[in-house]
């Protein structure tokens, strides 16, 4: 007789073998079962998403103009991690996938305090990510899908005379995840938290060109519910990571005043331009180095049998190079459209890499 498929228990697959003594034995395979890297990658996927969402909010849009504004943004992109030794060596499992979200953001208060411009507001977002995960040997482990809903708030301070600014963000996200392999469908829910402090100081190179050194610190945490699949229990420890981004923004600094409309159409005569070339436009590029450190997050698997528990702690530590570029145009007196695209490349460790594109509608009132 024979097993139709390997028997799974805890972190291992077992096969039925018959020895020379004619007795039958269950033996574990040399590698972990596919669900080990699959479930471990759930920690990384949620934290990658949370960081990308928080990073998609630009302080530039929140401080432009004197009026409160509402911004609607749509972003999509690719995210993943290279093979850096696999789960057996404590690295984040190799993965590749996509994400997308819609974010609505609005200013609540804009005022002047002690020579500083202060803006506060809130935002909400809904998104989805789907990532294919590979086993240590390069074979397919499965797919993790995540539906996420987020709420956040921000405080922006700008020193009126020097232009020095600071941007503080706090964000919470509810994650609903499903990890699917050939043998299991595992579901988990959890919460992600994030706090960010970003600062920059603009310098005018020419009348229309600006250089702005930037520095950002981000802390994030994650808590996923424990669960069980066909082979035993799955438990998650509290996850956390810290990130430092250092870079600069180089871009045009043109007057974005819309001026008088020039359209020949009567309904749009006072509010629209005759041609696209008349629209006020600014562009920017932003290269950065991002360092991830002090990452933590355990995933344990086992059964009721004593000694079966195995704990895995995939590291997200590493360094990546990031390049973002964007363009914004004022299409009405109170409406600005923006587009941006970016690419991140891991140069060491288990840092995330990928690319993204975003479109933003900004309306002042």
List each language-model region with its residue ranges.
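Outer membrane beta-barrel transmembrane domains
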Residues: 112, 149-152, 237-365
């Amino acid at each position: 007789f024979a097993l139709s498929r390997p028997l799974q228990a805890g972190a291992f697959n077992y096969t039925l073998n018959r020895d020379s003594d004619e007795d039958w034995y269950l033996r574990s395979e040399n590698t972990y079962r596919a669900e080990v890297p699959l479930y471990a990658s759930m920690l990384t996927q949620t934290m990658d998403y949370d960081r990308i969402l928080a990073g998609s909010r630009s302080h530039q849009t929140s401080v432009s103009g004197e009026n409160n504004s509402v911004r609607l943004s749509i972003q999509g992109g690719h995210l993943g991690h290279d093979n850096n030794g696999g789960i057996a060596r404590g690295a984040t499992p190799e993965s590749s996938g996509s994400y997308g979200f819609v974010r609505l953001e609005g200013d609540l208060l804009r005022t002047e305090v002690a020579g500083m411009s202060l803006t506060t507001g809130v935002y909400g977002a809904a998104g989805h990510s789907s990532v294919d995960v590979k086993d240590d040997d390069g074979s397919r482990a499965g797919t993790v899908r995540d539906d996420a809903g987020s709420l956040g708030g921000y405080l922006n301070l700008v020193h009126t005379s020097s232009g020095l600014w600071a941007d503080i963000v706090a964000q919470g996200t509810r994650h609903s995840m499903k990890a699917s392999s050939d043998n299991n469908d595992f579901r988990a829910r959890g919460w992600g938290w994030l706090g960010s402090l970003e600062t920059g100081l603009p310098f005018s190179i020419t009348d229309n060109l600006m250089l702005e050194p930037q520095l950002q610190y981000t802390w994030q945490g994650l808590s996923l519910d424990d669960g069980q699949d066909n082979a035993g229990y799955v438990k998650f420890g509290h996850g956390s990571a810290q990130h430092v981004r250092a870079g600069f923004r180089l871009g045009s600094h043109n007057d974005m005043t819309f001026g008088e409309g020039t359209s020949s159409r009567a309904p749009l005569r006072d509010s629209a331009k005759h041609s696209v070339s008349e629209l006020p436009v600014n562009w920017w590029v932003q290269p950065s180095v991002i360092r991830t450190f002090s990452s933590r997050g355990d995933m344990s698997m086992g059964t009721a049998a004593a000694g079966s528990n195995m704990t895995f702690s995939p590291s997200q530590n590493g360094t990546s190079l990031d390049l973002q570029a964007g363009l914004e145009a004022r299409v009405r007196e109170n409406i600005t459209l923006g587009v941006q695209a970016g690419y991140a490349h891991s140069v060491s460790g288990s840092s995330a890499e990928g690319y993204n594109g975003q479109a933003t509608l900004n309306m002042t009132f």
